[in-house]
Amino acid sequence: MRAEARAAVGELLEAAGLSPGQVLVVGCSTSEVIGRRIGTAGSEAVAGAILEPLLEATQAAGVHLAVQCCEHLNRALVVERAAAERYDWERVTVVPVPRAGGALAARAMRRLPDAVVVEEIKADAGLDIGLTLIGMHLRRVAVPVRLKTAAIGHARVVAARTRPKLIGGARAVYEMQ
């Protein structure tokens, strides 16, 4: 799973073309990764195996990592305090734990430097491991990215990048001539 996570995040970062300072949101059901139904068998060991490659890749790219909590915490996100302050994200008071927040968010809370929890963000790209519904935290307009890495363990992987809206209708011009 570590190699699959490394491959998936690498493919997405390349396809999305994120610049330093942009944000990648990740949602992950470790239950789904081990072949169980979401929310039933979270694994801190699996969370660690997935989080480390995510951190390595995002830190190397200068991209902020946001880890989505589960439904019990309203899909709040674990981020570094510096990112929360830079983007003026509203902080909330909670400590994610495996049974309320999810194993990956709980691990991220302990592992990210100066971690805090925020209620919502608008990320530039997203990686959804196990169909955790990260779309609420993506900028508009989300564009699907089909990865070669279609699964991590047993969990399906869905990815997206974002682009600015195209506005103006039939007479609009979208590229500088």
From Swiss-Prot:
InterPro entries: Antibiotic_NAT-like, DUF436. SUPFAM superfamilies: TTHA0583/YokD-like. It holds the Pfam family DUF436. HAMAP family: UPF0340 (MF_00800). Belongs to the UPF0340 family. This is UPF0340 protein STH78.
